[in-house]
A protein has these predicted regions:
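Hydrophobic, well-ordered secondary-structure segments
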Residues: 1, 170, 185, 218, ...
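Cytoplasmic-side transmembrane-helix entry/capping segments in multi-pass membrane proteins
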Residues: 148-158, 212-221, 280, 349-356
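Residue-level signal for the membrane-embedded core of alpha-helical transmembrane segments
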Residues: 131, 225-228, 301, 393
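Transmembrane-helix bundle of Major Facilitator Superfamily
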Residues: 2-200, 357-360, 364-367, 380, ...
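Transmembrane helix-loop junctions and nearby membrane-interface residues
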Residues: 110-117, 198-204, 234-240, 264-267, ...
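Hydrophobic alpha-helical membrane-insertion segments
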Residues: 49-53, 78, 187, 195, ...
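Hydrophobic transmembrane-helix bundles of small-molecule transporters
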Residues: 176-291, 298, 453
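12-transmembrane solute porter fold
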Residues: 24-50, 57, 61-70, 74, ...
Length: 474
């Protein structure tokens, strides 16, 4: 057996090419899935606790909303760093460190006594959670052998479950306990993940430490500063009375443009770039990253505003409008699961085309409104279901696309994918809410925004022809 490709599994048995025994694959997947579920729940769980935060911490609803913004900003900025750290220091180490940081920050969030401390801690919590996806992807690639394509594809179901049940759990904690419970519940879960990972996730391969490169601190600073400034700029648009010519928008946007220009200039000249340029914009990779940003903006960004649309245009109450996203989440779960197991037969492009067409149909139906005697709630739920089905069909393919070209960069590619989708989501929500804030008829305006999103996706569908195609396992 080639020593370079040996790895010791949790029971001490060597397996070729980093492949764990089937019984341990299930345990490993369950461990990383629990971490991903915990992180994805926390992305949405705070939404239903904002009024409780405002009351108990004696603050405004705007400041309470920054607990969500801080999580989004911290997550996006730290993602590429954790991807690189997984490559340099090992995915198991980064996974354990990320879970420990997330758990500690969650405990501190639950004990916070003012809104300003809570906002900072939410950013730190997100920084810990940002390491979950890159490290988990690398763990799957390293230890699942020929089953890794399906395991990575199933991640989409986990995220859909988390984002769907997050607001429900948040409401239950606020109603029957306290808002602090939405953070404190992560402590026993995080400890359980750490203990299980120490016992069952195989150690990182020794070759990682031997090929460690010098970390590109300048590249990390430029990308982090550019992303943070850019996200602050677009987040400002979502605030009340915000204007595109306001210094609070123009200054951070200018800083973001300058920092990102310097970042790309730097990595093209550096001997040890923070992220290899071809992984961002090279053949195949650049197309996948652009598509992920567009899909994230539409399926996570625009669709997140469906409850607001239901209320503004059709007068549906808060409970009814909130449950509309359950239809979208349920469809995403089912079709992500099915798509992960069909991927070897379909390849990447066919489900991405099919998913895109179904998403377009769902968005157009949302914009059009109910026909004949169909109740508005049923129409909106059916439309949201279609968007979720398209999202689910696309997820396994878009998660795997490109990975087989550079499996040694699996953690960085996973970080780039999640970062692109998150940026698309934040930008879309910020722009849409800014437009709606200045509208005299927000319901009808939002319908046009849904139609515009559908048109944008139609224009982007030809890009799928440039996605690297692959059938079978890799």
């Amino acid at each position: 057996m080639d020593a370079q490709h040996e790895v010791r599994t949790a029971d001490g048995v060597l397996s070729p090419r980093g492949e764990s025994r089937p019984v341990h694959r299930g345990l490993i997947f369950a461990i990383v899935a629990l971490a991903l579920l915990m992180m994805s729940i926390d992305a949405t769980i705070v939404a239903t606790a904002l009024h409780a935060l405002r009351r108990d911490l004696q603050t405004s609803i705007d400041w309470a909303g920054w607990t969500i913004t801080a999580y989004s900003l911290g997550f996006v900025v730290i993602l590429p760093v954790t991807g690189k750290l997984s490559e340099q220091y090992g995915c198991r180490r980064v996974f354990l460190g990320s879970v420990a940081a997330f758990t500690a920050a969650s405990l501190c969030c639950g004990l916070a006594d003012n809104i300003y401390v809570l906002i900072v801690l939410r950013g730190l919590q997100a920084a810990g959670g940002a390491g979950f996806t890159p490290a988990a992807t690398e763990i799957i690639v390293d230890h699942f052998g020929n089953a890794r394509d399906r395991a990575v594809g199933l991640f989409g179901s986990i995220f859909a479950i988390g984002t769907m049940i997050g607001p429900i759990f948040g409401g239950l904690f606020v109603a029957y306990w306290t808002w602090r419970g939405i953070f404190l519940v992560n402590v026993p879960l995080g400890i359980a993940v750490i203990v299980l990972a120490l016992c069952y996730v195989p150690r990182d391969r020794s070759r990682i430490g031997g090929n460690r490169q010098r970390m590109d601190a300048a590249g990390m600073a430029l990308l982090g500063g550019g992303l943070l400034s850019g996200m602050l700029a677009v987040s400002h648009l979502a605030e009340r009375n915000a204007h595109a010519w306001s210094p609070a928008f123009v200054i951070p946007l200018a800083i973001a443009i300058a920092a990102l220009w310097m970042f790309f200039r730097h990595i093209n000249r550096s001997s040890y770039p923070f992220i290899a340029p071809h992984l961002i914009s090279g053949p195949g990779f650049g197309t996948v990253n652009l598509i992920n940003a567009l899909y994230g903006g539409i399926t996570s960004g625009a669709v997140a505003l469906v409850p607001l649309y239901a209320s503004n245009r059709y007068g549906i109450d808060a409970l009814g409008s909130g449950t509309l996203l359950v239809a979208q989440g349920a469809a995403a779960i089912v079709f992500s699961f099915a798509g992960a197991f069909a991927l070897r037969r379909t390849g990447y492009r066919r489900p991405m085309y099919a998913g895109g067409v179904v998403i377009v149909a769902g968005m157009l139906l949302l914009a059009l409104g109910p026909l004949a005697a169909i109740p508005p709630y049923a129409w909106l739920a059916g439309s949201a279901f279609l968007v979720g089905a398209g999202r689910g069909a696309n997820n396994p393919a878009s998660r795997n696309a490109g990975l087989q070209l550079a499996p040694e960069h699996a953690s960085t590619l996973a970080a780039l994918r999640t970062m692109c989708m998150s940026i698309g989501t934040i930008v879309t929500i910020s722009i849409d809410t800014a437009i709606l804030a200045g509208s005299h008829d927000p319901g009808r305006t939002q319908a046009w925004l849904f139609a515009a999103a559908a048109a944008l996706l139609v224009a982007a569908l030809p890009l799928i022809a440039r996605v690297p195609e692959h059938r079978g396992s890799w």
